[in-house]
Amino acid sequence: MAAVDVNQTITGHKSAIIRNYTTNPRLIYQTVSGVNGPLVILNDVKFPQFSEIVKITLPDGSQRSGQVLEIAKNKAVVQVFEGTSGIDAKNTICEFTGDILRTPVSEDMLGRIFNGSGKPIDKGPPVLAEDFLDINGQPINPWSRIYPEEMIQTGISAIDVMNSIARGQKIPIFSAAGLPHNEIAAQIVRQGGLVQLPDRPHEQTNFAIVFAAMGVNMETARFFKQDFEENGSMENVCLFLNLANDPTIERIITPRIALTAAEFLAYQCSKHVLVVLTDMSSYAEALREVSAAREEVPGRRGFPGYMYTDLATIYERAGRVEGRDGSITQIPILTMPNDDITHPIPDLTGYITEGQIYVDRQLHNRLIYPPINVLPSLSRLMKSAIGDKMTREDHSDVSNQLYACYAIGKDVQAMKAVVGEEALSSDDLLYLEFLVKFEKNFISQGHYENRTIFESLDIGWELLRIFPREMLKRIPAKSLDKYYPRGGAKE
């Protein structure tokens, strides 16, 4: 009997494959058997396909779209992107399209604003598509990837000198509620560009920004939109907005649609694209909601066990590819729940990405902007993007020495709280002086202050001159001879 069932199934699948759906249209179903959170369960479905898109028509005539998540015999579990409120089990009509989720892409998307599903919300016409691309992207052959080597100058000293970002890198901003991560991201977008070396002509690069917001409030969306408009870059920006009052489930596809648009602009239009994704914590919580609705075995803190893999499908879509002029640099922003860096979201993100920029609440409380704590921050690709002919030959040594002095200064500050200032040595007092001036003069800067890498390095040298030359053990004698004397050589 089982063999007959298998043969019937194979025959049925063959007939479904060779069927001409242009003249013999798809079946529509009114077999909704249950609704659970963002999921709809359908019975008696013939030949459903994994990840197939389903068009859902409600009794009032409004349409929604969903995606097949799971198939069991003749049952299909469909995830509805616009939410399941108002779905009537008897009168809701579902049509299986036989295709995966594709998004229309075009160079005309720049300067436009879309919702989380990729539909225009700026009162403009629909995008005249040059292509329809799978939102999950195409896998990139690791052999074809180009190692990121060109440094992006952000104009922020704490990033440029201590945690340099390379073009094609993925580096998140680890922040928390109430911290100015949006302002930092906006400043990076506003000021970002290649390092302009004295012997290199000024390069006008093909620059574009793709901004995707997931679960943000109206104030955050308005802040970014207004900032892009005020600095004149709106015609180079493509915005995807899923607001806090939009369907939670839509957040699953928003970053994928944004990255599909970014890949088209980078690899087909030869643009250097900066992708800003905020807030990845909202995305992970949407993932947890779907997982809970499917009654999957939960992992840490209720998040699904496959969250690492799922986040990787987003973050790994950054980089450069051989034979293509464009690049994708990713700056995801995530808010750490309860300022906890060991929470699964920042923890797994840190494994996948090439470093992180850590926004610190204590620095913010002391009115230091940008409140970037350089000690837990890291850029894993920094070493290949700095040095002679890329920034300046003393860059790496100055960065190492600043790190060492700041770390020792923090230790001395902790010791001072225990033993008092009178018990400190003269060297300890120098480190304390450096600590205060480093945070005040180096880390702290204005919202619209755009420092070149050379200005930032010179500020670093001014701070290092607090110490006698023999205490600067991480800088070679050649660099000390050139830059340590006051008014040292400037490029």
UniProtKB/Swiss-Prot annotation:
SUPFAM superfamilies, A to Z: P-loop containing nucleoside triphosphate hydrolases
Statement: the UniProt record of this protein carries the keyword Ion transport: yes
Residues holding ATP: 380
GO biological process: ATP metabolic process; cell-cell adhesion; positive regulation of apoptotic process involved in development; positive regulation of neurotransmitter secretion; regulation of syncytium formation by plasma membrane fusion; response to hypoxia; vacuolar acidification
Listed GO MF terms: ATP binding; proton-transporting ATPase activity, rotational mechanism
Any one annotated GO CC term: proton-transporting V-type ATPase, V1 domain
Keywords carried by this UniProt record: ATP-binding, Hydrogen ion transport, Ion transport, Nucleotide-binding, Transport
Cited function: Non-catalytic subunit of the V1 complex of vacuolar(H+)-ATPase (V-ATPase), a multisubunit enzyme composed of a peripheral complex (V1) that hydrolyzes ATP and a membrane integral complex (V0) that translocates protons. V-ATPase is responsible for acidifying and maintaining the pH of intracellular compartments and in some cell types, is targeted to the plasma membrane, where it is responsible for acidifying the extracellular environment. Essential for the proper assembly and activity of V-ATPase. Required maternally for early embryogenesis and zygotically during morphogenesis.
Alphabetized HAMAP family for the sequence: ATP_synth_B_arch
Subunit: V-ATPase is a heteromultimeric enzyme made up of two complexes: the ATP-hydrolytic V1 complex and the proton translocation V0 complex. The V1 complex consists of three catalytic AB heterodimers that form a heterohexamer, three peripheral stalks each consisting of EG heterodimers, one central rotor including subunits D and F, and the regulatory subunits C and H. The proton translocation complex V0 consists of the proton transport subunit a, a ring of proteolipid subunits c9c'', rotary subunit d, subunits e and f, and the accessory subunits vah-19/Ac45 and vah-20/PRR.
Family listed: Belongs to the ATPase alpha/beta chains family.
Protein name: Probable V-type proton ATPase subunit B 1
Lineage: Eukaryota, Metazoa, Ecdysozoa, Nematoda, Chromadorea
